[in-house]
Curated annotation (Swiss-Prot):
One of its GO terms (biological process) is positive regulation of transcription by RNA polymerase II. Keywords: Activator, ANK repeat, Nucleus, Repeat, Transcription, Transcription regulation. This is Calmodulin-binding transcription activator 2. Residues 537-615 form the IPT/TIG domain.
Length: 1202
């Protein structure tokens, strides 16, 4: 059946034949009218119906291109006659700045690909699109649709207009005049109503253009978006939080001594202070490179700066070097910004003026900070503590005590950790005058009154991480207004709308900052080499803050042997060369903003920097898809944790008030601020520990689940934040209280949320290694529970770039214990969200603590325990799988199986994690043996060393030892090599008492704690006594005689031989298994090949039989036809001869009448003629059938193989 119909299109006397699918013509109706505008996108069916209504195209076609069609316009063009792309709008261009960036795709109608689409985006307003469609069979007729699709808030109203990020086009349209901007923006916003912050329903495009001209002077281009949501059109005082992902704070690309700009937005425009004199020449200038200053700039201000010098200060009155402070106070932005409805808590009426402080340290003799650990790309890729400010990571604490005291609750603005990754990647941070940080520190201070802190309460100061130096006071102004302001690296909730500061708006100031520095300050910032290559393109150009997105980067990369890496704002991640010119990497986690992206090699940077974007998620509404589900919002999750604990505490208070169970223990300390920095987990742990002794309650009612919890339990939230100590404490609570259904519902490692994600899935997706290992050791079944998309935790960890976490869990999964860990069995889980029974309660290990490091906290008697590493200095390599064990000794491996499981040497060389308990007391099982699998590799290496150190005379086969000990010692005095190579044995024997053993400590024949362990020199002296003449007379009987050395050598050979045989046996077994697999696969291959061959032969035979049969039929029909034809010819000949033959002689008497004779002949003739005609018709019909059969046989048959 023909599936395509031909349609002729008459086009100015040209007839064009178009083949369209018949199904398409049948299912789509013809449109009598083309709408001139539509404020929504057309469906594929509507587009196709417009394009197949060929008879109306002459009426609908536009003969000339329209200049700047308004929003919603639908126009039909003929691309051969009209250049429709020249419409007067400025569209987004590619990185070369020449060609327009277009997105192409094919569209389906009723499952058939018949449409082609080409999309472009406006360079001024990114929500304004031009979409062009045409039929694949008729590409000349193009349907063009212009539409502005604004981002919608949760309330359903349109968010404020958003402008594009930094690009080459932005520099062009910012140079336009007011009339040109009006001409561009007016048609874009046709038919759109915006909600404003002061409650008005409409806005004026003229106000918008005026605001653009005011906030973006015609100077160097600003580097971030001009967020127009920061004020109202009138005098409205409603506070506002812009939830648009286009409003960003730039994370600067700076060196350790370069400028670090952290902008703290504000909700209201500040009042302009008077203009002060310019910068004094005697003030020391900050050093920066052009690249760092340009990439750390933000949107500028329309007014000049207030510049005031401040006297240098030092701690304790001493002046060991000056600290010059430069205060740059920015002026207000214009009012009239458009604001949607605020969703967060309002704040008091502020009186702001924003100041930018440049602190230039000039102390060259400050003590250096402790060096940072060795750089590891996987550590930066996966660790939540470097370059990532959510998930419980350690942020940068402010260096000013006044600011610490005034630090107000704000988790969204808490990050500001641009110093953290740069210090980790480039070396130790510089020290300040009094031992704190030294260097150029840019920050923005909001000089608000202290009334803002009334609604929140003063929060306790957040302790700095252990490696950070003590803070030093540095007053910013003579009036000391810091104490009344907000924290320097944070602000109150909702204070996020102040337009960021732009250094690029002030070229004179930048020129002074880039000029020569004071001679006492070195300049470690490397200058870019002019030979750096250029990144031609990279995709995608943005990621969410959790990272893990695959990024492809194109450029002149051709060396396969080069070790490439990609640097995202000083966070280096490994990159692989997919093909010549294309690099692949996975972006790390980072805070929201624009960051620099650079390709580096072994020697240093290989390319110039480009801008990569981290976009914030919109968490005010629930994620609608599984792909957006495993994401994180600090503030919301921490609030959920506190709300859950508050519900449980209320429940306990109700039961205590009803007199069911007396409430025990002290009241929980109030947690005043929701989600401050590193101390939040510690405060929540204290709160949970205070609830444990008074939690002996049982109730039939369950906790109320609110909608923000997304079906996540308390353990889900703790795992998502990476709170390992909180998970530990919750497991201890679960082990104490085993009969509570409410607690089981909240603390169950097999519980799932709305998208079937377990707590382990959350920890793996967000890269929290310690939390993931704790949850895995708690219940291994969680590793095999997929989410609603069928993804397992390990696959999610791999796909998000958390490679080290996935390897650690795979290693733990391979080390399946032969004995079950001593976990106390809890009752089967009856949680409604989980259909699995869970064995999820760990028993209290000895002293009731669920310590992470109890198996590795043992130390020799009399020696202090190893100092724990601070959490900020621990690398991923330090966190071996065994270190994160929950105190349960692993099952012993076989002797020879160790080499496959541990290739990095004994675990005793790894540093220990800090103990999980707050009081720092070591558990009772601290002296328990370490992992048993250390012994095999030591025994093998010991045997090897013994064989190498044994003298050659001992190794001979004809060895005969002398009976006298003295003689044997005299013979061995020349064996200097033995004493030189036996030092390893001394260190081994020194630690052999602490190596694990398969017998319990109670079965040992002596008390371990009562015997003093000999030191290494003692062992060396004992072992070297057999090769030197020292102490021969006293210790002759204690040294190793020749026979003993021979026995030791034979034992070492036996061990080595057994190990080699075992390795050979394992290799032989593997080869036999491989051979069996190959044979089985080959047999199956041969069997399948024979089956396929037989099938092909059968198919050929069938086709041959069909061909023979058809040929025989045609041959038989042809033969019958020829016989019939010959018979007809004979009949005709006989009839003709019969007609010519003369009649019989005339008989008078017996003759018939002439009339009767004529009628008889006529009847005979008629019968013969009828027979002949019938035969001819039959022959003609058979000839037609034969011809049709021959035509069918002549056609190529697709199924036949020749």
């Amino acid at each position: 059946m023909n599936t395509k119909d031909t349609t002729e299109v008459a086009e100015n006397s040209h007839h064009l034949k178009i083949f369209l699918p018949k199904k398409l013509l049948e299912c789509l109706p013809r449109c009598p009218l083309l709408p001139p505008e539509r404020l929504r996108w057309n469906t594929n069916e509507e587009i196709a119906s417009y394009l197949i209504t060929f008879e109306k195209h002459d009426e609908w076609l536009s003969c000339a291109p329209k200049t700047r069609p308004q929003n919603g316009s639908i126009i039909l063009y003929n691309r051969k006659k009209v250049k429709y792309r020249k419409d007067g709008y400025l569209w987004k261009k590619r990185k070369d700045g020449k060609t327009t960036r277009e997105d192409h795709m094919k569209l389906k109608v009723q499952g058939m690909e018949c449409l082609y689409g080409c999309y472009v985006h406006s360079s001024i307003v990114p929500t304004f699109h031009r979409r062009c469609y045409w039929l694949l069979q008729n590409p000349d007729i193009v349907l063009v649709h212009y539409l502005n699709v604004p981002a919608l808030e949760d309330c359903g109203k349109g968010c404020s207009p958003i402008f594009c990020s930094i690009s080459s086009d932005r520099r062009e349209w910012l140079k336009w005049s007011r009339e040109e901007l009006l001409g561009q923006l007016k048609p874009m916003f046709h038919g759109i109503k915006w909600s404003c912050g002061n409650g008005t329903e409409e806005f004026s495009v003229e106000h918008l253009v005026q605001q653009i001209l005011d906030t973006h002077p015609t100077k160097p281009a600003p580097r971030t978006h001009a967020c127009l949501c920061s004020g109202g059109l009138g005098s409205g005082s409603l506070t506002h939080k812009c939830s648009s992902t286009k409003h960003r704070i730039i994370s600067p690309k700076v060196e350790p001594r370069a400028l670090t700009l952290t902008s703290i937005p504000h909700a209201h425009p500040p009042e302009p202070p008077p203009l002060i004199a310019p910068l004094p020449p005697e003030l020391p200038k900050a050093h920066t490179s052009p690249s760092s200053s340009s990439s750390s700039s933000s949107s500028g201000f329309a007014e000049p700066l207030e510049i005031r010098p401040s006297p240098p200060t030092s701690r304790g009155g001493s002046s060991r070097g000056g600290t010059a402070i430069l205060l740059l106070t920015g002026l207000e932005q214009r009012a009239g910004g458009l604001t949607p409805t605020r969703h967060l808590a309002p704040q008091a009426d502020p009186r702001p003026s924003m100041s930018l402080a440049v602190v230039v340290g000039t102390e060259p003799s400050a003590p250096p900070a402790p060096p940072s650990p060795a750089f590891d790309p996987d550590r930066f890729l996966n660790s939540p503590q470097r370059g990532q400010t959510y998930g419980g990571g350690q942020g940068v604490s402010p260096d000013f005590p006044e600011a610490e005291a005034a630090h107000t609750p704000c988790s969204a603005l808490e990050p500001a950790a641009a110093l953290e990754p740069q210090a980790a990647a480039r070396g130790p941070p510089p020290q300040s005058v009094a031992g704190g940080r030294r260097g150029n520190c840019f920050f923005i201070q909001d000089d608000d009154s202290g009334e803002e802190l009334k609604g929140h309460g003063a929060a306790p100061p957040i302790p700095s991480p252990p490696p950070s130096p003590p803070p030093s006071p540095a007053p910013l102004e003579p009036s000391s207004r810091v104490g009344r302001g907000e924290a320097l690296f944070g602000g109150p909730v909702g204070a996020s709308e102040l337009e960021p500061f732009s250094l690029s708006s002030f070229p004179d100031l930048m020129g002074e900052l880039i000029s020569d520095e004071a001679p006492s300050i070195p300049a470690p910032t490397p200058q870019l080499s002019p030979a750096l290559s250029t990144i031609t393109d990279f995709s995608p150009e943005w990621s969410y803050p959790e990272g893990g997105v695959k990024v492809l980067i194109t450029g002149p990369w051709t060396e396969a042997a080069e070790h490439y890496s990609c640097v995202f704002d000083h966070i280096a991640v490994p990159a692989s060369l997919v093909q010549p010119g294309v690099l692949r990497c996975y972006c790390p986690a980072h805070e929201v903003g624009l960051v620099s992206l650079q390709v580096a090699g072994r020697e240093g940077p290989l390319s110039a920097s480009v801008l990569f974007e981290y976009r914030a998620r919109r968490f005010l509404s629930l994620p609608s898809t599984q792909l957006d589900w495993l994401s994180l919002d600090d503030n919301q999750f921490r609030m959920s944790i506190l709300e859950r604990l508050e519900q449980m505490e209320k429940r306990m208070a109700e039961i205590a008030a009803a007199g069911q169970v007396p409430c025990q223990g002290p009241d929980a300390p109030p947690v005043q601020d929701e989600g401050q920095g590193p101390g939040f987990e510690a405060r929540v742990v204290v709160l949970v520990e205070s609830m444990i002794p008074r939690s002996t309650w049982k109730g039939p009612e369950r906790l109320a689940h609110g909608s923000p919890f997304r079906g996540m339990s308390l353990l889900h939230l703790a795992a998502a934040q990476g709170y390992a100590r909180l998970i530990e404490t919750l497991s201890q609570w679960r082990s104490v209280e085993t009969g509570s259904l409410d607690l089981e519902q909240e603390v169950d490692p097999l519980n799932v949320d709305h998208f079937s994600c377990t707590p382990l899935m959350w920890a793996c997706a967000l890269g929290h290694l310690e939390a993931a290992v704790l949850l895995f050791r708690w219940n291994r079944q969680a590793l095999s529970i997929p989410d609603s998309l069928g993804r397992l935790p390990l696959s999610v960890a791999h796909s998000r770039g958390h490679v080290r976490l996935a390897r650690c869990l795979e290693e733990l999964q391979r080390q399946e214990p032969s004995v079950e860990p001593p976990f106390a069995l809890s009752p089967p889980s009856s949680s409604p969200d989980t259909g699995l029974s869970s064995v999820s309660s760990p028993s209290e290990l000895s002293d009731g603590t669920f310590s992470v490091t109890s198996a590795y906290s043992s130390a020799p008697d009399g020696s202090p325990p190893p100092a724990p590493l601070p959490a900020s200095e621990m690398t991923m390599e330090d966190m071996a799988p065994g270190q994160l064990s929950s105190g349960v000794p692993e099952a012993p491996l076989l002797l020879m199986d160790y080499e496959a499981t541990n290739s990095k040497g004994p675990l005793s060389s790894l540093p220990a994690l800090p103990p999980a308990s707050d009081d720092g007391a070591a558990p009772e099982d601290a002296d328990s043996p370490q992992a048993v699998d250390v012994i095999p590799v030591d025994m093998i290496s010991l045997a090897k060393q013994i064989i190498e150190a044994t003298p050659e005379r001992i190794k001979r086969e004809d060895f005969v030892g002398l009976p006298e000990a003295g003689a044997s010692m005299r013979e061995r005095t020349g064996a200097v090599g033995l004493s030189e190579t036996m030092s390893w044995l001394a260190s081994y024997l020194e630690n052999v008492d602490h190596f694990p053993s398969s017998t319990p400590p109670s079965e040992l024949p002596f008390e371990r704690g009562r015997l003093a362990v000999p030191s290494a020199p003692s062992w060396a002296e004992f072992l070297s006594a057999s090769t030197s003449g020292k102490m021969e007379s006293d210790f002759a009987l204690l040294t190793l005689s020749d026979h003993e050395q021979r026995e030791l050598y034979e034992a070492a050979r036996v061990i080595q031989t057994a190990f080699r045989k075992y390795k050979g046996r394992r290799l032989k077994e593997q080869q036999e298994v491989a051979a069996a697999v190959i044979q089985r696969c080959y047999r199956k291959y041969k069997q399948l090949t024979w089956i396929a061959l037989k099938f092909a032969l059968y198919k050929k035979m069938t086709q041959a039989a069909i061909l023979i049969q058809s040929k025989f039929r045609s041959y038989y029909e042809q033969k019958r036809f020829q016989q019939s034809r010959r018979a007809a010819v004979l009949i005709q000949q006989h009839y003709r001869s019969y007609r010519r033959r003369p009649g019989p002689p005339h008989r008078t008497s017996a003759t018939l009448p002439a009339r009767n004779k004529g009628s008889f002949l006529t009847k005979k003739q008629d019968q013969a003629a009828r027979k002949i005609m019938r035969f001819l018709r039959r022959c003609r019909h058979r000839m037609r059938e034969l011809k049709q059969n021959q035509e069918l046989e002549g056609l190529p048959q697709p199924g036949l193989a020749t």
